[in-house]
Amino acid sequence: MTQAILQLSEIEKAFPGVKALDKASLNVYPGRVMALMGENGAGKSTLMKVLTGIYHMDAGSIQYQGQPAAFKGPRDSQEAGISIIHQELNLIPELTIAENIFLGREFTGSMGRIQWSKMYAEADRLLQRLNVKHSSKTLLGDLSLGEQQMVEIAKALSFESKVIIMDEPTDALTDTETESLFKVINELREQGCGIVYISHRLKEIFEICDDITVLRDGKFIGECRVADTDEDGLIEMMVGRKLEEQYPRIDVKHGETCLEVVGLTGSGVHDVSFTLKRGEILGISGLMGAGRTELMKVIYGALPSEHGVINLDNKTINPVSPQDGLANGIAYISEDRKGDGLVLGLSVKENMSLCALDKLTKGVQIQHGEEVIAVEDFIKLFNIKTPTRDQIIGNLSGGNQQKVAIAKGLMTKPKVLILDEPTRGVDVGAKKEIYQLINKFKADGMSIILVSSEMPEVLGMSDRILVMHEGRITGEFDAKDADQEKLLACAVGKKINEEAA
């Protein structure tokens, strides 16, 4: 194999109470795509932060283009030709696309004036390369999350980088946007660029990557060619054991109807009706922009409804705020856990109990003893990997943050639990744990709505499935009668109704 353009060797990094990296290594080769795999908490993000100078390593070495390297920070590594596209976007909604791409390095003339036309033309060229249909004069805030991700990628391309690190780049992308990204990755590969591709989507790894490096518990487990392994072998390397059934669905006798929605119309939702029983998992499928999240937010009270009826336990409710939703007994776990779900600067305990303070308060006093017992119970039940309950949640891995977000909803003791993309950005091992928790809630008689863009997840975990297109329900199926082909047909607007009688 060619000489590596970038080598991270036996990197060590410790934080109070946890050794994040324990002799972790990574090689990046020119003209090849290296997948960096591992469960949440395996050390992938920490390794990238050591590389780009955000963290200082305790031991180990970095070689870049055959020379020892130590970067002072992301700007330093970027100027050297190493760009990183983070999972959390680093963009400003109030600026145009072009201003975001060239922020801090605007094109200027001899008098120091910004050469706007030249800057917009170059930004438009980058957008065209990524098949983004917007003018670079468009405000970033007017773009969808997926389109904003493409702007972040355009920004990395503008540096003419020799190494590009992509952290979950397709998480918020549509299938079409993912295809455009893969075309660009192939172009970069042909130009000799070395790419690090971090993703939990195994299908993508086998489609776009050449090599795989696996980390587990901060340790280097191995490097192999994609052609020399398969999904089962890769999962075993990542989790250290074989995963049996991927979707552990259980059969539970359903109780009475808990939630009934009739003719609901609101923000992005048109004339939606459905029911949900106790002990039932109702899957909601559809393409990006179909209105799934909007429907959940209208039911929860985070978006306004125009007309229609929501009945909970045979009583009509009219939630006009998330507080109403919680008070009614509806918990909504957002798809955007870092934007809507969690306060990253607060501790695990504070995040978990934030929405349940009324249940932990007597008079005006928070019952801290009860709070600690409840939080510790959830940490144990959910197998949340944290040194203590007082750990700042921003320091936890994505999978553990997601478990805290779900626990936060359950602390309110809801009748209906809405899970919007509960396993997005979560590794295969943590996914299995989340599925097992969902089954536990189901067995306890809780009513669950599972919104997911992953059709196998909806098919594997749901009892019944609704499909949405342009804010309307275009299909309803019993899980045993559904398959990906039927769901996709409904997702693009073809009406089917095959619910079992």
Curated annotation (Swiss-Prot):
- The residues that hold ATP are G38, E39, N40, G41, A42, G43, K44, S45
Q: What class of enzyme is it?
A: translocase
Q: What is its EC number?
A: 7.5.2.7
Q: Which Pfam families match?
A: ABC_tran
The record's listing under Gene3D superfamilies reads:
P-loop containing nucleotide triphosphate hydrolases (3.40.50.300)
Q: Extract the coiled-coil ranges from the record.
A: none
Q: Name one GO molecular function term.
A: ATP hydrolysis activity
Q: Where in the cell is it found?
A: Cell inner membrane
InterPro entries attached to this UniProt entry: AAA+_ATPase, ABC_carbohydrate_import_ATPase, ABC_transporter-like_ATP-bd, ABC_transporter-like_CS, P-loop_NTPase
**Entry similarity comment:** Belongs to the ABC transporter superfamily. Ribose importer (TC 3.A.1.2.1) family.
What does the protein in this record do? Part of the ABC transporter complex RbsABC involved in ribose import. Responsible for energy coupling to the transport system.
What is this protein's name? Ribose import ATP-binding protein RbsA
Q: Which organism is it from?
A: Vibrio parahaemolyticus serotype O3:K6 (strain RIMD 2210633)
